[in-house]
């Protein structure tokens, strides 16, 4: 079994694309394939010591799911399936996609929701990311002046995505016992 579980929720496929770009940097022994949370059981998800989790922020700051007009189930439906699990001793890194121009008041709020969910259940969340280079008004994904994970805006800053992903993976690798 791979050491790191890589899971995402997606509506348009952008988060899936980023997850697949992350997976390409690791072999199968190190990281699982990128798997949509609507295709994983709670048991399979919970078996990983290390998790990299991705989410877009939809509408006015919502997690993807049926109530936010997604065509398929996503984080909104998956989180209740794992809410009773204890994530103590697990290390989680988050990446989020959002639109800082179209939704500056709640940029990456869904990533903030995932952060709260996993920290409340004992997980150690790593991979805080600087807010420098972003222009937004508010975000629940900012704690102590930094994003709680990798912040991506494919709508307005797509040219910075590859560089940001590479820098973030280098930052979190030691937390997962890896070197890049």
From Swiss-Prot:
GO terms for molecular function: electron transfer activity; FMN binding; oxidoreductase activity, acting on NAD(P)H, quinone or similar compound as acceptor. Residues 4-173 form the Flavodoxin-like domain. Pfam families: Flavodoxin_1. The keyword Transferase does not apply. Low-potential electron donor to a number of redox enzymes. NifF is the electron donor to nitrogenase. PANTHER family: FLAVODOXIN 1, FLAVODOXIN 2. Belongs to the flavodoxin family. This is Flavodoxin B. SUPFAM superfamilies: Flavoproteins. Keywords: Electron transport, Flavoprotein, FMN, Nitrogen fixation, Transport. Its cofactor is FMN.
